[in-house]
Design a protein with these regions (language model features):
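Structural signature of the two symmetry-related core transmembrane helices
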Residues: 77-91, 286-301
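Symmetry-related core transmembrane helices of the 12-TM Major Facilitator Superfamily/SLC fold
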Residues: 167-183, 377-395
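Helix-to-loop junctions at the C-terminal end of transmembrane segments
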Residues: 61-74, 272-284
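A late C-terminal transmembrane helix in Major Facilitator Superfamily
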Residues: 334-373
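Cytoplasmic helix-loop-helix junction between adjacent transmembrane helices
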Residues: 106-145
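Extracytoplasmic gate region of multi-pass secondary transporters
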Residues: 221-263, 269
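Helix-loop-helix hairpin linking two adjacent transmembrane segments in secondary transporters
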Residues: 140-185
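Intracellular juxtamembrane helix-capping segments at the cytosolic ends
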Residues: 116-129, 324-338
Length: 403
């Protein structure tokens, strides 16, 4: 079914279990369709923390998991603890409805669970795959991530119609990942397995270091990936978080319609995820140029359109380009690090990315203070930032192979 380097093959169940790690990776956005209801339920509190607080705990947890995964603790053990905390912290607010503080504690537990698993999927892909197969699998992983996002958000949006706390029952879908965990493959270099050096294609990877450190190009690639993902989360997450408010402002529908828009956001990402390998190896660095320009156009649609159908198209474009840009960043990183460094490199990039998600709440408040408006200003800022990045990557080629 899927190639397991050039030395073996994963069973179908192992392949499915590996990809199932990605299913819950968009879990933080599950409550987005219900943000309007949550804002009404907690008018005197910073309701945005319900969505952004988990990312604060995702950051250190992701870094810790990346440092110990396969070295001191099995990948499977970390994944198990992560999915259990995902379920407990995700579902508990349905029952604990009296205190905003208790709700935030639950979201913190949930964030730790997400963080433990956040980097494992991409790290395992880089452990097992190289070249085009690696790009394909990164794309498939994002396909599953967005597939999970579609279902989590659709279920959450539908449940929100019964009450704000019903939204959190959508996290029960994480049980699918828990059931498949028993088949999750364990890398050969795991702490409990003999060490094997993976095959490294000439021209794409670099010799393994004597220590856990990276060479110069590896450090640059990790820093660039982390910066791009941080910036993407910082400027795009407020738009995703406010999508239900945007639809209400445009009189384009309630929580269910907003959930449909968010599902289109994820569904379009699924489509790109399926074809990512072919797109990336065809366009090379132009993947970034194309992605940033089209994302800016999608944001423009959300900022200026008024009809429900057109807003849906804008949401779909944003989702498509989000996956394209995120996966491109990881694919570029994979060309400059060794398989044994993948868990730490991915953890750093993912952790910094989620730090951008947490900072987005304060970034949104800052925009509100400066402009007096927090719904459309983030859209206009994203358009400007992405246009600048697209222009920069027309000049700078991160894929050039310097010695």
């Amino acid at each position: 079914m899927f190639v397991f380097t050039k030395k073996g093959v994963l069973s179908p169940l192992q392949s499915i279990s590996l990809l199932a790690i990605f299913f819950t990776s968009m879990g933080v956005a599950t409550v987005s369709p219900a943000m309007a209801k949550l804002a009404a339920q907690f008018p005197s509190n910073n309701y945005a923390l319900i969505s952004t607080l988990p990312t604060l705990f995702i950051v250190p947890t992701t870094l810790w998991a990346g440092a110990v995964a396969g070295k001191k603790i099995r990948y499977r053990t970390i994944s198990l603890v992560g999915i259990l905390l995902f379920l407990i912290g995700g579902i508990a607010p349905f029952f604990l409805t009296e205190s905003f503080t208790v709700l935030l504690v639950c979201r913190a537990v949930f964030g730790i669970g997400v963080g433990l698993r956040a980097s494992l999927g991409n790290a395992l892909v880089m452990q097992y795959y190289t070249g085009k197969e690696q790009a394909d699998m990164l794309g498939y992983g994002n396909l599953i991530s967005n597939f999970g996002g579609v279902h989590l958000q659709m279920v959450a949006g539908s449940l929100a119609e019964y009450g704000w706390n019903y939204t959190f029952l959508a996290h029960l879908l994480g049980l699918f990942s828990l059931l498949l965990l028993v088949f999750q493959p364990e890398p050969e270099e795991s702490c409990c397995a003999p060490t094997v050096t993976a095959e490294v294609p000439n021209g794409y990877r670099h010799s393994l270091l004597k220590s856990a450190g990276f060479d110069h190009r590896g450090r640059i690639a990790t820093a660039l990936t982390a910066f791009l993902l941080f910036l993407q989360q910082l400027v795009s997450y407020p738009i995703l978080m406010n999508i239900s408010l945007l639809f209400e402002h445009r009189h384009a529908g309630g929580a269910t319609v907003a959930a449909t828009a968010l599902s289109l956001y994820s569904a379009s990402g699924c489509l790109i995820g399926f074809f990512f390998g072919k797109i990336f190896y065809k366009l090379k660095r132009l993947t970034l140029v194309f992605g940033y320009f089209i994302a800016a156009a999608g944001a423009g649609i959300l900022g200026f359109a008024k009809q429900t159908e057109i807003l849906m198209i804008g949401s779909a474009i944003m989702g498509m380009t989000s996956v394209l840009l995120i996966t491109s960043a990881y694919a570029i990183l994979g060309m400059y690090i060794s398989p044994n460094q993948s868990s730490l490199a991915i953890a750093i990039a993912t952790g910094v990315s989620n730090l951008g998600g947490f900072a987005s709440a304060y970034y949104l408040n800052m925009l509100g203070i400066i402009t007096g408006e927090k719904l459309f200003t983030p859209i206009y800022v994203l358009m400007g930032v992405y246009t600048l990045l697209a222009t920069a990557f027309m000049v700078y080629d991160p894929l050039r192979k310097n010695s």
